[in-house]
A protein has these predicted regions:
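Long, highly charged, low-complexity intrinsically disordered interaction regions
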Residues: 3, 55, 61-80, 89, ...
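Structured, non-catalytic alpha/beta "coupling" segments that mediate domain-domain communication
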Residues: 73, 87-90, 98-100, 225-238, ...
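A glycine-rich phosphate-binding loop feature that marks nucleotide/adenosyl-phosphate handling sites
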Residues: 180-187, 319-323, 379-381, 405-413, ...
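Duplex nucleic acid-engaging cores and interfaces of nucleic-acid transaction enzymes
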Residues: 49-51, 59, 63-73, 77-318, ...
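Single-stranded RNA-binding regions, centering on S1/OB-family and related RNA-binding modules
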Residues: 550-551, 555-719
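Short, ordered loop/turn segments at secondary-structure junctions
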Residues: 37-39, 128, 238, 321, ...
């Protein structure tokens, strides 16, 4: 198999691009580095294309390894024919390789192997040959043997039937045909174990859908319902068509002595051996594809959450709401340093006196520290906390304080972690959580990288998936996001640094330790003095780490040190000095380069690299998050009972799933925009219309107070 050619066709790119990317990956370069600094080599393949390429490369290389193992095993048995070798080498999937290997795989003791041990294989051959002119019972008498444990004719025939059934089951062509036919024409159904039991799986108590039409989220829901023992799930195959096909392939002659017994064997082989195995394989394949789809959606949601724009330059009060144990508060300054923490008790069980005391405490903190924004976690008691905050803000209108509801998913996981304990050794879990909720609005990326991505909770059935596959995909998303933004080498935490291209957890800690011991970095080259950070790691990481106010102005940009010579020569040619970079004097630089091709040749670099350098010098360390929608800051409160059909509101997309999106409209119950209500045009997936963090206009089309459900529509509102 030509792996490069296969990937080229799948990704719909040029062969040279794939060859270059594979070479760079094999040389130990990271995806963010290749995507950002090797555009010339790959023809500007982006991080998403490179990750898809890497995933397929890994799968296809594993497939080739498996083929080589299988070929060696069959060859060692002396059973490898040219035709079989060609079939194995041409196989496109691991499943087909397994099908072809099945007859030669060392077998555990089965009914067929026991029958072979009893000397019944020749009888099976006679029946399968279909040439005998005697009744099979007569042929079987010759194989009755007390010594071999074959007591009578019936036992001899049963053993021969078992051998034939296994042979039919081992035939790769049959399995491939049956799997394809079942996938094409079969269905999956589910029934309730107890129809009286109420559960979230009630729509699956009597459910059936064709396999080819089954949506990924339904497959994952069926799996979970089955795992939790609410439903029974089965694959319904086109059995009559399958048996007709098998009979036609197995029964070659119309022999009245063998045809009846072979029909029985064919049915037994399918129902006992082939059918259950194919059912398992189909469900496993459907689950894999559903997981891949869900992981893709989870990754997109996570990326949008990580790439939310920071609300910089504000003193923020983080509010972690709770009932009985009180609301934990933490004030952090504009750099994220915690200035003060306390606990207030304005939520149930409470009194007017406690509510007044809470308001006074918060007003005092606002006055003392110059708080201009309150970040409220969206968990338990958020609604009640919000009401107290709104009432209090009305008492101090001159302060111009606003509040924002912040997704607190994962904050409790972080606050109880070893990392949080090291960061805030003198705080309790609640105070750490409040500080995290405050910092999340100041710099969402820097705060969210401290939490296991799975705990951030913007996925679908994430806990039911292959955790290794999920972890790898989400780590890739975090890595790409961190490197897109880049970090300040002198302020970034170890949690942030470990996601930078080429940096491991150990090296991230070493960078922080070096900083603490030697003071701030003044030059990117200083990174080479950090323990375990060698030339290769430096090449991979340097461009993503910036130094403000260092010795070299280019260190404050995303220009890679390998291009400093070219960047300096460019500035000189256009009449600028390096200091003009940090002074912001290079706006409009792109218009001064009249001929990029000629200039690139003069500088000895590629044209794409030159364009990237110019873009970076024009606007150094540009933050891609600036283009994302800003969070909605509020000063008043709306309740679910205030909603009326037809109302148009602004909301924030909190989660995107296969069948729609949940939108926070400020009433503490996210509303659902079904995929059919997103846009007038047809879309296959909600991600074509919205992403997590988007600010959208929605119309209320239904409110169910009893079930606490809000139905929303975006049709005709978002141009």
């Amino acid at each position: 198999m030509d792996i490069i050619q296969v990937i080229t066709q799948e990704l719909k790119v040029e062969k040279w691009q794939v060859e270059a990317a594979v070479k760079l990956i094999d040389e130990g370069n990271t995806i963010p580095f290749i995507s950002r600094y090797r555009k010339e080599a790959t023809g500007s393949l982006n991080d998403e294309q490179l990750r898809a390429l890497f995933e397929r490369l890994t799968y296809l290389r594993n497939l080739e390894d498996k083929k080589n193992q299988v070929l060696k095993s069959i060859e060692d048995q002396g059973k490898l024919t040219e035709e079989l070798k060609k079939q194995i080498l041409d196989a496109q999937t691991l499943v087909v390789v397994e099908d072809l290997y099945r007859p030669y795989r060392p077998k555990r003791r089965t009914r067929a192997t026991i029958a072979k041990e009893k000397g019944l294989e020749p009888l099976a051959d006679i029946i399968l040959l279909q040439m005998t002119d005697k009744p099979v019972e007569e042929e079987a008498r010759a194989y009755v043997s007390e010594e071999k444990g074959v007591k009578n004719v019936a036992e001899a025939l049963n053993g021969a039937k078992d051998i034939i059934a296994e042979r039919i089951s081992d035939e790769a062509d049959y399995r491939i045909y049956i799997r394809n036919l079942t996938t094409k024409n079969g269905s999956i159904s589910s029934t309730a174990k107890n129809a009286e039991t109420q559960s979230v799986y009630e729509m699956y108590y009597e459910f059936e859908e064709p396999i080819r039409k089954l949506a990924g989220h339904r497959i994952l829901a069926l799996n979970r319902g089955e795992k939790e023992k609410f439903i029974t799930v089965k694959v319904n195959a086109p059995e009559e068509d399958i048996l007709r096909y098998l009979n036609k392939r197995v029964i070659k002659k119309d022999n009245p002595n063998t045809t009846p017994i072979l029909k029985v064997v064919v049915e037994d082989s399918y129902k006992r051996l082939i059918g259950p195995a194919i059912e398992r394989e189909i469900r496993s394949d459907l689950t894999d594809k559903a997981e891949d789809g869900a992981i893709h959606v989870f990754g997109k949601n996570l990326e949008q959450l990580l790439m939310q724009p920071p609300i910089a330059g504000k003193v923020v009060l983080g509010w972690d709401p709770a009932f009985r144990t009180g609301c934990k508060l933490a004030v952090v300054d504009a750099t994220g340093k915690v200035l003060d923490t306390t606990v207030v008790y304005p939520t149930a069980p409470t009194t007017e006196k406690k509510i007044r005391a809470a308001k006074d405490t918060v007003e005092g903190m606002i006055e003392k520290y110059g708080v201009s924004l309150i970040s409220v976690g969206n968990g338990t008691a958020c609604r009640e906390s919000e009401q107290v905050i709104v009432d209090m803000l009305k008492e101090i209108p001159d302060k111009k304080v606003q509040y924002v509801i912040t997704n607190e998913a994962g904050a409790s996981v972080y606050s109880a972690s070893k990392l949080a304990t090291e960061e805030f050794p003198n705080f309790d879990v609640g105070q750490r959580s409040a500080a995290s909720i405050a910092r999340r609005v100041q710099d969402p990326l820097a705060e969210l990288v401290k939490i296991d991505p799975k705990s951030i909770g913007v996925g679908q059935y994430q806990h039911d998936m292959n955790q290794k596959k999920l972890d790898e995909a989400l780590s890739g998303v975090v890595e790409d996001s961190v490197n897109k933004v880049g970090v300040d080498l002198n302020t970034a935490s170890a949690s942030l640094l470990e996601y930078i291209s080429g940096i491991s957890k150990a090296i991230a800690k070493n960078i922080v330790a070096y900083r603490e011991e030697n003071g701030q970095f003044t030059d990117r080259k200083e990174l080479l003095k950090v323990a375990k950070l060698g030339p290769k790691a430096f090449e991979q990481c340097a461009g993503f780490m910036r130094i403000s106010g260092g010795k070299n102005p280019l260190d404050a940009t995303s220009v890679h040190p390998e291009s400093y010579e070219a960047a300096s020569a460019l500035l000189s040619k256009l009449g600028y000095k390096p200091n003009d970079v940090v002074a912001g004097n290079l706006l409009g630089l792109s218009l001064q380069v009249k001929d990029y091709k000629k200039m690139a040749a003069e500088l000895g670099i590629g044209e794409i690299t030159l364009r990237d350098i110019v873009k970076e010098l024009e606007k150094p360390a540009r933050d891609p998050r600036d283009d994302m929608p800003k969070p909605i800051l509020r000063s008043d409160v709306l309740e679910m009972k205030d909603l009326k059909e037809g109302m148009v509101l602004k909301g924030t997309v909190r989660n995107v799933i296969d069948f729609g999106a949940f939108v926070d409209i400020g009433v503490h119950q996210d509303g659902l925009v079904h995929i059919s209500e997103m846009t007038e045009r047809f879309i296959k997936h909600p991600l074509e219309a919205v992403s997590v963090g988007d600010i959208v206009d929605v119309r209320v089309i239904g409110v169910d107070m009893k079930k606490k459900r809000i139905s929303l529509s975006m049709k005709g509102l978002n141009k």
